[in-house]
Amino acid sequence: MQINGLNRLTTDVLIIGGGTAGCYAALTIREKSDASIIIAEKANIKRSGCLAAGVNAINAYIVEGRKPEDYVEYAKKDADDIVREDLLLTMSERLNEVTAKMEKLGLVILKDENGRYVARGNRNIKINGENIKPILADAVNSLENVIVINRLNITDYIVKDNTILGAVGFNIDTGEAYEIRAKKVLCATGGAAGLYKPNNPGFSRHKMWYPPFNTGAGFAMGINAGAEMTTFEMRFIALRCKDTIAPTGTIAQGVGAKQVNSLGEVYENRYGLTTSQRVYGTVRENIEGRGPCYLRTEGISSEQDESLKKAYLNMAPSQTLKWIESGKNPSEQNVEIEGTEPYIVGGHTASGYWVDTNRRTTINGLYAAGDVAGGCPQKYVTGAMAEGEIAAEDIVKELNRSDITENAFSQSTADEYADKLTDERIKEYNEYLRREDKDTIFSTEELEEAMQKVMDTYAGGIVSHYQFNEKQLKLAKEKIEQIETLSEKANAKDYHELMFVYELKERLTVCQVLIEHLKARKETRWHSFAENLDYPEKSDEWLKYVNTRKVDGRIEVKYRNLVGRGETYEHSN
């Protein structure tokens, strides 16, 4: 088997990833310009990305009596100060506007008898959001001069002299290669799951918090192209209902359930109420012999029972089925909780591309938005949309500039370079497709499991209670590099398996950068998220960003000063 031909396409804007941020960016670009757009989506935009199964709340909203600055302060506190306040503020100022636009497109937002949105806490409003992604996808599909290419797996940027020219990939179904040239490129590929050994084994390994199909592709392409990354050491670990990995917020906020240990003691206030502290408290209670830990639902009303079962049917039906199977309602049994494996996701933590306030990366012409963009945690759905809108507006502005300078190289030089890189990638695709089983040592799945075990054991996974030390990280680095070498001899029987090969390569690249970040921050600022046993205390000396950039095959660490309230960062060095 081999690659089935080559399609060369040209567009004004290439959007890689048709999830929340990517789709919303496309709507904004077409609303404000006549620019042509190609959206390259690995799955199908109707049900792809984090919104695939729907959501029951907008978790980032400025409710009545609050202001955008309040949201900035909340996110800053949760991240213990390691945030970009300029990014948080520009996002927060748009949260309500993008929500209103989604309502106009058909999203059902619950309202009280006075016509006001029904709040769920200080930053959330309730919605009927099972169909939120199809609503967004339908709006994109109705746009003129927008081509959506589903089942297209982008593997590489085309970057010359730190300027992006487009991207290369292949169709998972047809095996056709694609070289897409664009004036501007937006990366909206989501975060990275599957780096660590998951909660559940075997067939159920993808029963996880974050989409298992988000494999860090955008991160890996940026890393390999020399883009600067930030704060990967701020991993995200979700506190979830045990086994089903269903959300806990619906119970905690919906019925006011507290975290309790097996003795019935409320322990959450003992450790703190930030996201990482809630996970850490649960871990410590189990280590110290007071587990299992639960959300206390015993004693809630029958109406609350029904409300919870209906809510979970809408977004995590396995939790409702578990209640039914046990023969007990939530009011009759507490809900056991556990932490997930760690993820790299810029929508909840500050990890991702280092961007300026317009969401430009350090590669000229390349933007990042949503879970792939760093510095701006607690984005959730509306924050991803806001970042897509911010990037889109700057893209339109740049495309409309009459004084725009040409690249330092000619069009013919750019064409020659792009074609050469595309030919190299097609050759690489074919090497994986043509390699027979007898010529490879391990399958892609075996290598993925090996990678996850290494990260779990030596880089702070579930088995080590999310803890690590420098000696362990050194071993993790060595072993991940060994697995990366073995991955070069992987093989694929078809185009779908070829995608798995590249997903493995993407994860390995992200793992290497993550390990360097965990090593570089010599403190424990976020319990569980980055629990460094060699440096168990927090220090003001580390009130700074840990950034990295791959240069000549090596990952270089760079420290940057915090961007505080009233400050704005623009790329200069």
What positions do the PLM features span?
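N-terminal Rossmann-like FAD-binding beta1-loop-alpha1 element of flavoenzymes
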Residues: 13-39
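Helical element adjacent to the flavin cofactor pocket in flavoenzyme catalytic cores
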Residues: 129-156, 160-163, 168-179, 219, ...
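Glycine-rich active-site loop/strand segments that organize a redox cofactor
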Residues: 59-91
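Core beta-strand elements of the Rossmann-like FAD/NAD(P) dinucleotide-binding domain
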Residues: 8-11, 174-184, 362
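Long, amphipathic alpha-helical stalk/connector segments used for oligomerization, subunit docking
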Residues: 400-493
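Mobile, glycine/GP-rich and aromatic-enriched active-site lid/loop segments adjacent to catalytic centers
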Residues: 96, 103-155, 231-380, 385, ...
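Glycine-rich loop(s) and the adjacent beta-strand/alpha-helix scaffold that form part
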Residues: 187-246, 381-394
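Glycine-rich FAD pyrophosphate-binding loop
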Residues: 31-53
